Amino acid sequence: MKMKIGINGFGRIGRLVARVALMSDDIELVAVNDPFITTEYMTYMFKYDSVHGQWKKDELKVKDSKTLLFGDKPLTVFGVRNPEEDPWGEAGAEYVVESTGVFTDKDKAAAHLKGGAKKVVISAPSGNAPMFVVGVNEKEYKKDIDIVSNASCTTNCLAPLAKVLNDKFGIVEGLMTTVHSITATRKTVDGPSMKDWRGGRAASFNIIPSSTGAAKAVGKVLPALNGKLTGMAFRVPTVDVSVVDLTARLEKAATYDEIKAAIKHESETSLKGILGYTEDDVVSTDFVGDSRSSIFDAKAGIALNGNFVKVVSWYDNEWGYSNRVIDLIRHMASVA
């Protein structure tokens, strides 16, 4: 039986989660809510994507103001501002992906339950909802948990890598830098940004230092690393694909070749499909459309000595993350 999902917020992640869902045999997308766009514009935004290309799987057309057709399959569209008013139950949506970026608080996301949803997956970090990273701690999920966070794209990249390093060699402490592509909140030209002055500068013309909670969040999904990692970001003028640089001090001395071998082994076994491994001379665009959370770049890393190492891992911060949202729903359904 297919898992029926709804999506609240049809932005970058909402639209890509929809693509993943529509490409999955075990998932049925039944409803989308976005109060700011019409069904006609929703169709256009879904069909054409500057990064991931044109949608060609099914013909997409508007049936009426509240229904889209993917081939002959109807999709119900709402235009509701308040989550508690979304009629998810009527549409048959059991799992709701909260991808507006607004309702990341557990209590605010809980409003979807009032509309008939059974479970809510927040596609962003949350201050108080339990966070799960597929491949790292999803087995901690219990069926009585109704609201979860899929953490951030960067945490999804860093956590599997940190898990392997910590399991095999032990991490004493580490600093992470993510070189991160442009996202929707960035400015096209210099503009007001009172909370983050640098973040208000033109994204296409600058390398912008920024804060990120991604490294600290690893401590939430891997308690053994709580307090051992922190990090920052450089926002750069690329539209998709980002890269994590983790510099760590190890408890157990290891050569860089031993570290590579450990990561390669896990990428082929317990973390297959989540953690990748490459020895090719790759650059960022080589990972557009890569569904894995984290692809370790064996040639990019370096060790100073047996206990001090820098490891580098790529991620499609849009497509990889959207695939994990669906994977998390699959896992939740298997537990329920």
From Swiss-Prot:
Known EC number: 1.2.1.12
GO biological process, one term: glycolytic process
Chemical reaction(s) catalysed: D-glyceraldehyde 3-phosphate + phosphate + NAD(+) = (2R)-3-phospho-glyceroyl phosphate + NADH + H(+)
Keyword Membrane: no
Binding-site positions, D-glyceraldehyde 3-phosphate: S152, C153, T154, T183, T212, G213, R235
Sequence positions that bind NAD(+): R12, I13, D34, R81, N317
Note: Plants contain two types of GAPDH: cytosolic forms which participate in glycolysis and chloroplast forms which participate in photosynthesis. All the forms are encoded by distinct genes.
Protein name (Swiss-Prot/TrEMBL): Glyceraldehyde-3-phosphate dehydrogenase, cytosolic
Species of provenance: Petroselinum crispum (Parsley)
Organism lineage string: Eukaryota, Viridiplantae, Streptophyta, Embryophyta, Tracheophyta
